[in-house]
Structures are given as C-alpha cells and as structure tokens.
Amino acid sequence: MPAPLKGSFESLARQNEKTEEDGLERILDEQDLQDRIDHKMLVPVPVSASLSINNNLAETHRYVRPWTATFLGDLSKAHAQRFDGPIQVTSAVRTVDYQKQLMHVNGNATQAEGDVVSPHLTGATIDIGKNTMTRAELAWMRNFLLPLQLDGKIDVEEEFRQACFHITVYKSYAPPLSPAAPVIAARKARSKAGAQVASTDDPQ
C-alpha cells in the first residue's frame, strides 16, 4: 500500500502562492460567486456515471475552475476503467463568508482570511471523498495523484478527519489553446476530409 499523501503547512502555503501566480482571487460572497459563474470563470463539476457530487452542496457551490473540471473528467474516467462505482466530489468552490461559517463548526477548517487560507476560495480545489473507497482504490488514487504532484500540476493533502483527498489543480494542468491551435485543428480536419473523398473517388 502506498503511503498516504499527507499535507503540511508548507503545502498549504504553496497552494496559496501558486493559485495567486495563476491570477486567482478569493471569492468573497454569494454575489461574487454568482458573478464569476455568469462570466464563465467557473464551470459546473462534470457529473457523470463515473463522477458524483455531494447532494448537500448548494447549487452554486458545485462549480470549479475549467482546468479543475478537466482534471476531474480525466480522474473519473481513469478510475472507471479499474473500478465500479463513481468517485464523489464532497466539496468544491467556497466563498470567504462560507469558510468563516465552516470554521465555527469544523475545527479542521482552514482560515478564511490572511496570507494562508483555504484554496477552495479560488475555485481551483476539490475534495474527493474516501469513505466508500476500498484499499485497492486508495492505493490507486495515491499512485495516480503522486506523479501529477511531483510534476507541479496539482497539490494533494490526504485528510483523515474529513476522510478526503484535498486536491488543488493548477492552470498548467490544462493550459489554454494557443491562438493558432484552432486554425491548425481546422486544417487537419479539412486534410482528413479531403483524403477520405479522394479514397472514395478511386476506381475499384
């Protein structure tokens, strides 16, 4: 069994630094959150047969950054190739106001204000529940996540009181397409279509 991916204050500080480098701001309240949803800065958690979400989360708290959604899609598809049943997102975006409330009921909750705060406030972070995972699934998750952490694409803190994988995904996980990428893709599509037409026209 691979060792747990334990967190540390250094890891939390790094998550704050890197999300700031990614240009992400802390989401203050529900109005601020709704504005970012309306402007497509946050997208829905990509729920599917292989990825579920905690039904207790408010509708507006079921959103993440686009690259975090891409990561969740990749993770859930890879998990589904090995195991039955979906993985579950137990927490996604939070606001500063919500985090303050959480601190009153959860002694494990990270600060809402200051230099080092919960990266959930940026929308880049999700929690994946561990309660229903088998030992084989836990081992698989650790083996899947560790290389991405070593590559600087994510940071992981395996929590035990809340029984989850706390994962912050960085923008570099799914960098935006370059301006030329759509043009190149269109050329490739046209070239492929032309080749198919030529093949159809060939005499038998």
What is each PLM-predicted segment?
Residues 1-72, 147, 157-163, 168-189, ...:
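Extracytoplasmic cell-surface/polysaccharide-interacting catalytic and binding patches
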Residues 57, 61-72, 92-95, 119-121, ...:
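Solvent-exposed, acidic/flexible segments
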Residues 69-73, 77, 100, 139, ...:
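Solvent-exposed, polar/charged alpha-helical surfaces in well-ordered, non-transmembrane soluble domains
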Residues 85-102:
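Acidic helix-start/capping segments at beta-turn-to-alpha-helix junctions
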Residues 97-113:
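Charged, often glycine-rich, active-site loop that binds/positions anionic groups
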Residues 110-204:
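Catalytic cores and adjacent binding grooves of peptidoglycan-active enzymes
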